[in-house]
């Protein structure tokens, strides 16, 4: 492994390898993560940690990586470069930074650390990750007073605070697997995705674990093409048994929710394949969708959906009233329609409500909510917004090991009207309204309003527009940085930063706009509001 840094001299890098593990073809993909401590350790020093993995790697490869430290405003202050060898095991690179730029201490402010990594000659797209860090003691943003919305412990009986928003917040993990596909592994044996239908723990165990962990919602989202017990095709598979397994999962979720009021157990599917495809969740389908057949020509599903035909899938989802989520989207090569990645269709816009913005690593065995390996997808979600999609942000764990909701403190916050019970129907209604926020801190909340209207709304406006970022931090946590982001649906351009304050009043240009808020806490955890969509007249 080689590394270089400009303008600083090279530092020693520590490399550690985890155990190699075979991976089903569904998870053969390059993964790169960046852990950048938000606050410095001793004096001004801190260490950035790069993680590289390639489940199912067929032959050794070289990762070329670049890390940039960007000043407030975006100018590059430092750049490190290096290489790492991939031999089938996970690789960790420690990158120390002294807190200095050249010979001088870095001025105080909110900086950004960016990782760009690619497997040499592999053909897969490069992976980019970016996180903010605090250098010195930056000035804190002024935040409006905001009374935190009641959570599940008080809902639905709790009345909103005087002048408060009439909603209760329910916290969920909307992406996980059990032994109905390639998840559900015992923690001590979980090194990656499991051979389909082989692990010990199913939906009942997942719902009970997540409930005990304090979640309000867990979605078991099983890979739709693994109900035959194979990551490929199984000629001798029993089609009736595959369909029955999906129905058993639905029944399990219904029974758990009925027996445990206040907890919503969801069962659905993660449709698609990752390579030359793209994964998406469907939360409310009572039908198993698929394309594989056995040797008799029997469909391993209730309803045939051509593999990779996202336009047809969106149309079917609209006809059935199903609601979906873009899972860990890549910026290129996924969700193709007519050869265009992340392509907009009116049907897709109607049914796709969420986009995962940050996930903890799918194969974590952490049960103390302290996992440091996370993947960041805000840039891909922004491309979907710029394409014209009306999606809110979510953050989930994609658990494949038996730690549903326990790998980190990230949750998707779902706003249900006060007085309305949490149910599958009220959950789906909230998703359709995009009343959702993503938080890496389960105790914090973020709601964006626009002229008093709720995030997720679409409305016409004349004259000034007032955006207010309403943030309630968990105990002892404060906002360290605020950004209001803006874009134009259908433009297919770049989302830009409108403001670094928690309130902005201005008159937009005529036409279509969207705005969302991002808040970074003083511990580095980040929250994203749902956007608002404004037609300025």
Regions found by a protein language model. Name each.
Residues 149-320, 326-327, 334-336, 365, ...:
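A metal-dependent hydrolase metal-coordination microenvironment
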Residues 94-108, 503-507:
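Signal that preferentially marks extracellular ectodomain short beta-strand elements
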Residues 89-91, 107-111, 511-513:
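A glycine-anchored, Pro-Gly-centered beta-turn/N-cap motif
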Residues 230-231, 277-279, 334-342, 402-418:
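Histidine/acidic-residue-rich catalytic or RNA/ligand-binding cores of hydrolases
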Residues 77-95, 493-502:
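Solvent-exposed serine/threonine-rich low-complexity stretches and specific carbohydrate-binding patches
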Residues 59, 112-126, 136-147, 152-168, ...:
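C-terminal functional module detector
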Residues 28-64, 459-468:
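Contiguous beta-strand segments within globular domains
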Residues 299-405, 475-494, 507, 513, ...:
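Domain-core and long-helix interface of multi-subunit machines
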